[in-house]
Amino acid sequence: MAERVEGIKTVVACGDDRTKNTIISTKKTAPEDDPSSIVDVDSIEAINKRTWSEKWAEYRKKPGSFIMFILVHLATLITVLSIGFLLVYVLVKGVPNLNADIFSWEYTSDNCSLVPALINTVYMTLLSLLIAGPIGIFAAIYLVEYAKTGNKLVGVVRITAETLTGIPSIVYGLFGMLFFTNACGLRLSLISGALTLAIMVLPVIMRTTEEALMAVPKSYREGSFGLGAGKLRTVFKVVLPSAVPGILSGIILATGRIVGETATLIYTAGSVAKMATKLTDSTRTLAVHMYLLSKEGLHTDQGYATAVVLLVLVVLINFASDKIAGKVAADKAN
């Protein structure tokens, strides 16, 4: 029997009779000799449009819905205005102060170059993620895939991770100063700051990776086992590729926290305005550079310019991560 594809609209009631949503199914197969089963899309008008008077009449009957409507829109407006004001303020203050001097290769008291701090930020971020990334991901794999159900250790680890996530960064800075800088003899250095930041972002990476792994359907694992794959192959060939977007989200969250961190690095990495050439060199990142310029009060304009560069850097990181996650998801779908 020949078949043809036609579009249909299925109307689903939601709430009372006046409030309905329209769900569009783009494809529908139907027998060639049964035209009555085909619904013409163009002949059906949208029925979920209501006038303001109709909405107001409903709100008068249900004042709670009206209050919720006001609160939701008010919260959205406050959020958008706050973020917009912050962005506009930073751009207005910083963009006019962007010039060739602050992009000089070496820092001096005259040009207040941010290039050494920018390069040090890249070093600090990569080194911290290189330490915390594998540990957090493999810890999450153990908790989700290998730990027994009801294991008390899993509960302890999760509670500890959630607690560490809420600890102020200054506490991590003091710990890093006492342990890595003093006890381990690493002094104020790039490696001290990276190790401290790795401990700080480890719970974020571990928890987001754990949630991403738990979101993978059990049918994927069962199908892999049914085809004869072992536990290790299933984890690395089936589960992890499916959880890549969620894992990337955790890494991006960690990256944003590393790039914007100040208090932790003042106590562990120092504030030397030079490009680090060794792991034991004292150095400063963009956030620390901006803080010190603002604190001194002599180069506030350069501090705003640094804030613009830092803002652009974070936006680019998030944009790149979204593109990578989208590409991975598209490749997986294909």
Language model regions located:
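Periplasmic/extracellular loop-to-transmembrane helix junction in inner-membrane transport proteins
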Residues: 51-74, 88-130, 150, 292-301
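Transmembrane alpha-helices
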Residues: 231-267
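Interhelical loop and adjacent transmembrane-helix boundary motif
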Residues: 110-112, 265-311
